[in-house]
Amino acid sequence: MYPGTDYAGQVHIANVGIGPESFLGQSPEMYTYDSCEQHLPDRTSSGNKGTFGKALLVAGSNGMAGAAILAARAAYRTGAGMVKVITAEENRQILQQGIPEALYGSCRQLSESMEWADVIAVGPGIGREEQALECLKKVVEKSRKPLVMDADALN
């Protein structure tokens, strides 16, 4: 709670209602840098970017290109071989300069992009625009791939 409590005035500790039942029978897990290694497959020397996993990111509303760039970089750093970013058209040039190795698309290409991907992440900087809501609904309703949603997607 520190250093935030130094700036908060009087602090009250309260039960916010998150108990064991909140996790749907699953215990929360924490991974450290060292413990993650055992969960990752070894990379074969004959592999290439297409064999190391394809991540689809639905990220970055107009003016929020930075969130999409950070998410794409994180996907590469954690092992994705290929990353495709579905983002607002206004962000395309910024993203291509910030992370040129990534692929780009629009919400119109979302269905084919979901088929292409091995895993999908939705939310970094998508905001509350109508197009963001349409993309989010499409992913949640139609995709059967592993899905990560951040706070923007949940809002």
Give the residues covered by each predicted segment.
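Small-residue (G/A/S/T)-rich helix-start motifs and N-terminal tracts that mark the onset
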Residues: 2-151, 155
